[in-house]
Every structure is written in structure tokens, then in C-alpha cells.
A protein has these predicted regions:
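Conserved, structured core segments of small domains
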Residues: 1-103
């Protein structure tokens, strides 16, 4: 167990929450661009785990392969955040490199 704990790495956990604007029809194109950006961040290894959540309180969670400050800066540039469609929380966390969601 000590060996495994010593392999832990710092990541950032993001919780994405919708604002009332999320539910407006004219927000759909911006939400689409938000999703495209997330896929690009995932492909680049910056946001390796992305989990959309389908309820009214949380839109999604993800793990950033960065520290919390860098994750905040990345999310501040998100088109949905900039448009006031989403708000987010960032929490520093630790995990084990190579962990993944099961196929």
C-alpha cells in the first residue's frame, strides 16, 4: 500500500453546475461549443475524465491533469462559463496515474 500511495499525483476535480440560462433554447449553440472544447481538452490529455451528469443541479464532473489553479484558468475561458450558462467549482485531489474508467 505504501508503494501505491507514493505514486499518487495531484489532479483537479471540477464540478460543473447549470445556471438558469442553461435551460434557455438560445443557449444550445454555446453548450455545443462547450462540449466540443471539452472533447479537445480530453484529446489533449488535459481533461482525461469527463462525466456528463443529467440532473438539474450538476451538469458534469471531470478530472483535470493539472493543479487547481490551472484548472480554474482553463474553465474561466470555457464558452459556457463566459456566457453565464455554467458555474464551476474546482477541488484539488489526488489520484493514481493510469487509473481509468472501465470500458
Amino acid at each position: 500500500m505504501h508503494h501505491r500511495i507514493n505514486q499518487a499525483k495531484t489532479y483537479a476535480l471540477m464540478v460543473l453546475k447549470p445556471t438558469p440560462k442553461y435551460f434557455e433554447a438560445d443557449s444550445r449553440p454555446i453548450v455545443w461549443e462547450h462540449g466540443r472544447r471539452n472533447m479537445a481538452l480530453q484529446a489533449a490529455g488535459i481533461m482525461p475524465i469527463v462525466c456528463p451528469v443529467g440532473d438539474e443541479q450538476i451538469s458534469g464532473i471531470c478530472i483535470f491533469n493539472t493543479d487547481a489553479d490551472e484548472a480554474r484558468a482553463i474553465m474561466a475561458e470555457d464558452p459556457g462559463v463566459r456566457a453565464g450558462i455554467f458555474i464551476f467549482e474546482i477541488h484539488g485531489c489526488r489520484g493514481f496515474p493510469g487509473d481509468a474508467l472501465p470500458a
